Amino acid sequence: ALALTRQAQEIIRPDLKIIIMSATIDASAICEALQAPLIESEGRMFPVETIYSETDIARYDIYKEVAATILKAADKHEGDILAFLPGQSEILKCKEILDASLSRAAASSSASASLSAASSSAAELSVPQVYPLYGNLPPEKQRLAIAPSKEGERKIVLATPIAETSLTIEGVRIVVDSGLCRKLVYDARTGLSHLETVTISKDMATQRKGRAGRVAEGICYRLWTQTSEHLMED
């Protein structure tokens, strides 16, 4: 897209102004290549506490650990929760666990509370709503995931890396990071490309952590050890 825009500028529209915006791009390299000035806009960031896992989690179990961490965090802290998983499959499996667990918790709460309509309503409001968020999701369901929570409501968003920089989710104060993503890998032997689950870079981890500090002080649960973090690519 940038190459075509530059070509249009050179051939058709020499007066065309080009603005390149990104939260993750290597700005110095782009500025050098295009001979363009750099303008930085830094939003306000609140402190985010980082909590590491004591052990590394097996990839095939990552959705279970994400679900367990979300439930633990929801009991200990306030605010909406954003969890990063590598793909749609893990998101749907994690959502299934959370829906079942939260339904049991709601039923238990209702049974021990008064049977009055007011008490029942309060019990319903206390149960977080779980929303998936990935590229193939219909637009109307994506809007539900990113819409601000109403007063008295709380939500849990299970997302792919689409929520790192492309979308803003207001109200998030807790991030649960699986440390994984899907990456398109080329196989020279077959001449084909395929999606592979890989460990994220330190930059991606920083982007994800920052989502918890947009509106207030937050917490980021990283499902890997500090030792493993030293081995991650920059």
Locate predicted features.
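P-loop NTPase motor module signature
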Residues: 2-234
